[in-house]
């Protein structure tokens, strides 16, 4: 289950291994990690590096160390923060359908609400900046992966326009979670013309300060994309 780590980035590698095992359920909530000496031997590291890694895992809300009891795994769904999302998603191989569904559901909710807020709070300068992003999507030479990233950045810019600090910090945190699935999203990208129309229609709604219209456009666009992706994996076992 555990494997020796390399000499470089020792603490980071320990964190990666233990975090991965906790997220996969190899260590369940309430389980006690092996004793420090044994765990250090299995990983092939010194105890100082192991302590550093355990401290980081505690800060993430994954484990809790108590004197006389050792280090126990916590229920991360109750104790961890949203920054854990990007680590909960595989960067290669088959996606976990449950996590993919959650990411797409969040993306739809997030896109709808930031479009609404952007229309309510946006000004002429915001419209100009959104148009600059939309112009990149209009490049006839743009490839599918670049188009997907530009479309995501359009929604990041909408978040800035909406001026909600929580949304801005949240999207900074989950950006890698979304982009880790880029290989799957690219496959189901709508045609460039559809992406451009969606972006232009949202910009027009912002110019008209029509929050409901902006939200409806974003929701329809993101719902269709999510349905296409999930329809392919429906009925297949998760990773």
Predicted regions and their residues:
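Juxtamembrane/interface motifs at transmembrane-helix termini
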Residues: 6, 51, 93, 147-151, ...
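Short linear motifs at protein or domain termini
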Residues: 1-110, 116, 234-236
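Short, 15-30-residue, compositionally biased linear elements
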Residues: 10-11, 189-197
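Short, charge-rich amphipathic alpha-helical segments embedded
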Residues: 223-237
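Conserved amphipathic alpha-helical segments that form helical-bundle/coiled-coil interaction surfaces
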Residues: 103-184, 195-204, 213-227
């Amino acid at each position: 289950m555990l494997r020796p780590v390399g000499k470089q980035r020792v603490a980071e590698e320990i964190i990666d291994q233990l975090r991965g095992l906790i997220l996969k359920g190899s260590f369940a909530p309430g389980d006690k990690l092996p004793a420090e000496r044994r765990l250090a031997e299995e990983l092939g590291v010194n105890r100082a590096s192991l302590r550093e890694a355990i401290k980081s895992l505690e800060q993430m809300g994954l484990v809790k160390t108590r004197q006389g009891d050792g280090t126990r795994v916590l229920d991360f769904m109750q104790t961890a923060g949203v920054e854990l999302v990007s680590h909960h998603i595989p960067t290669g191989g088959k996606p976990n359908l449950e996590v993919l569904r959650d990411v797409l559901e969040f993306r739809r909710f997030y896109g709808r609400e930031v479009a609404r807020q952007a229309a309510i709070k946006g000004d002429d300068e915001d419209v100009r900046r959104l148009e600059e992003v939309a112009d990149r999507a209009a490049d006839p030479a743009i490839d599918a992966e670049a188009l997907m990233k530009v479309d995501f950045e359009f929604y990041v810019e909408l978040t800035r326009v909406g001026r909600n600090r929580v949304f801005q910090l949240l999207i900074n945190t989950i950006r890698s979670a979304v982009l880790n699935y880029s290989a799957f999203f690219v496959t189901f990208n709508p045609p460039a013309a559809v992406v451009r129309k969606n972006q232009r229609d949202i910009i027009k709604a912002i110019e008209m300060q029509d929050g409901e219209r902006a939200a409806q456009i974003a929701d329809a666009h993101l719902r269709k994309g999510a349905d296409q992706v999930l329809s392919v994996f429906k009925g297949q076992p998760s990773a």
